[in-house]
């Protein structure tokens, strides 16, 4: 499963919107300056996710980064 597919699955399972996640990621790690357009690119697979962005996503969703290692 790709990073984008994993993110889509997590968002669906948890009932969270991209807007909610972007806002939460910026609260947790303001230095990443995530915006909706960039996150949408990640979710659709058109853009790669940096390590910091991945960590912020995991913290926002309260999950372990290990879910992306499968």
Where are these regions (language model features)?
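A short, Lys/Arg-rich alpha-helix, primarily the initiator
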Residues: 1-24
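Helix-turn-helix DNA-binding elements, focusing on the entry/boundary residues of the two helices
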Residues: 18, 36, 51-54
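Short alpha-helical "recognition helix" segments of helix-turn-helix
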Residues: 21-28, 57
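DNA major-groove recognition helix of helix-turn-helix/homeodomain DNA-binding modules
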Residues: 50-67
């Amino acid at each position: 499963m790709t990073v984008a597919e994993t993110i889509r699955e997590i968002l669906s399972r948890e009932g969270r919107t991209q807007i909610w996640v972007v806002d939460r990621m910026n609260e947790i790690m303001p230095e990443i300056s995530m915006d909706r357009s960039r996150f949408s690119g990640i979710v659709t697979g058109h853009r790669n996710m940096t390590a910091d962005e991945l960590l912020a996503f995991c913290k926002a969703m309260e999950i372990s980064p290990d879910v992306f290692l499968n």
